[in-house]
Regions:
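A short, charge-rich alpha-helical start-of-domain segment used by transcription regulators
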Residues: 1-15, 25, 174-182, 186
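Amphipathic, Lys/Arg- and hydrophobic-enriched alpha-helical face
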Residues: 6-24, 37-41, 108, 112, ...
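Amphipathic alpha-helical interface segments
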Residues: 15-16, 20, 30-41, 54-66, ...
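Conserved RNAP core-binding helix
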Residues: 24-43, 49-56, 78, 129, ...
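Arg/Lys-rich amphipathic alpha helix in sigma70-family domain 2
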Residues: 60-78
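Amphipathic helix-loop-helix modules that constitute alpha-helical solenoid scaffolds
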Residues: 70, 78-118, 127-135, 142-313
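"A position-specific structural signal for the A-helix of alpha-solenoid helical repeats
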Residues: 228, 232-235, 287, 291, ...
Length: 406
């Protein structure tokens, strides 16, 4: 039972303890002490009527007791001890609305723009999702000491810079929500299409990102929050078909669509419709709408490429970037033929954009291959190979290279 409560409520308890104690490390210590007490007492005394409230209360009072002991040796801690004692009897600290808002406070604090992006991701996975330092390091192919240092520095920055533990004001909320969504999507993207390593995907990361997306949807019912969750669900729906049994990369057009998860597609498509109907949607919703068009096509040949190009046109105006241009060019190639797409990709590369982006060169190689321009295709595949760090992608590109005529 304690294990079940830990899985379901430990992050909520931690979020409230951070608010009450004002420090990440003290809150984590209090959380550990509270669950240690639960393991000792619940089998003997029975499970409390409200386990979460019991854990928060126990953790807080253990922290207060520890602080009182420290005051004997460090007088500078007396003010903190007095404040904690006074707050302990404040009913506003315990009302349900405050406790529910604590999860939002934690997310916004972990994703504060004053923190470096890699620290935002590491802190969010550690504090909001509860992953260990070793799990985060393994997911991002980084050493545990590196991840630990990022987390330590992020906590120090929050403490020393006086970053408030709060939900942003209404005026600041749109920009801050964008930062949170960006962090969640970074986590998902690394799980959906790993930037390096032996696997195409990392289910642990994409699963955590979807869990975060669902949590945000509960706490912050905004159209773009729904749009991001829809995008993640629709992309995740194809996971089983994205690699062969041998672990080889399978392109979208060659995937066995019977392996796609129809429940995730239905949920994602419904979220897209809800976000679009709000008229307040943004880039994540538009990307999700594109993913929904792919998901709803019964076969690759039945894909509505005209609709996809139209959606990319809207996305390019809402959130212009070279990557959006590249994806639009690939869709134009499917609608109007490879030469039309190649012309657009060459224009992007001629500007100097995406010169070190392996997918730009692999897309160019594929269009040259389809046009029978083997020498250009070979050079572009070779360039893409030099830039990719993911083993299945490397094997795919090597296979395509070997299939080109001499």
């Amino acid at each position: 039972m304690v294990d079940a409560v830990y899985r379901s409520d430990s992050r909520r308890v931690l979020a409230t303890l951070i608010r009450l104690l004002g420090d990440f490390d003290l809150a984590e210590e209090a959380l550990h002490d509270a669950f240690t007490a639960a393991v000792e007492r619940w089998p003997r005394d029975g499970i409390p009527a409200n386990p979460r409230a019991w854990l928060v209360s126990t953790g807080r009072f253990k922290a207060i007791d520890a602080m009182r002991r420290r005051v004997r040796f460090d007088a500078s801690l007396q003010e903190i001890a007095r404040r904690w004692d006074a707050d302990a009897s404040d009913p506003a600290a315990w009302d349900e609305e405050s406790v529910e808002d604590d999860r939002l406070r934690l997310i916004f604090t972990c994703c504060h723009p004053a923190l470096p992006p890699d620290a935002q991701v590491a802190l969010t996975l550690r504090e909001v999702c509860g992953l260990t330092t070793e799990e985060i390091a393994r997911a991002f192919l980084t050493g545990p000491p590196t991840v630990a240092q990022r987390i330590v520095r992020a906590k120090a920055k929050i403490r020393n810079a006086g970053i408030p533990y709060e939900v942003p004001s209404r005026a600041d909320l749109p920009n801050r929500v964008d930062t949170v969504l960006h962090v969640v999507y970074l986590v998902f993207n690394e799980g959906y299409s790993a930037s390096s390593g032996v696997s195409v995907t990392r289910h642990d990361l994409s699963g955590e990102a979807i869990r975060l997306g669902r949590l945000l949807g509960e706490l912050l019912p905004e159209p773009e929050v729904a749009g991001l969750l829809a995008l993640m669900l629709l992309q995740e729906s194809r996971r089983a078909a994205r690699t062969s049994p041998a672990g080889e990369l399978v392109l979208l057009g060659d995937q066995d669509r019977s392996l796609w998860n129809r429940e995730l597609i239905a949920e994602g498509s419904a979220l897209v419709q809800r976000a679009l109907s709000s008229r307040r949607f943004g880039p994540y919703t538009l990307q999700a709408a594109i993913a929904a068009v792919h998901a709803e096509a019964p076969a690759a040949g039945a894909t509505d490429w005209a609709q996809i190009v139209g959606l990319y046109d809207v996305l390019a105006r809402a959130d212009p970037s070279p990557v959006v241009e590249l994806n639009r060019a690939a869709a134009v190639a499917m609608r109007d033929g490879p030469l039309a797409g190649l012309t657009l990709i060459d224009a992007i590369l001629a500007r100097g954009d995406l010169a070190d982006y392996h997918l730009a060169h692999s897309a160019r190689a594929d269009l040259c291959r389809r046009l029978g321009r083997a020498a250009e295709a070979r050079a572009a595949y070779a360039r893409a190979l030099r830039l990719t760090r993911q083993e299945p992608e490397r094997r795919f590109l090597e296979r395509r290279l070997s299939e080109l005529p001499d």
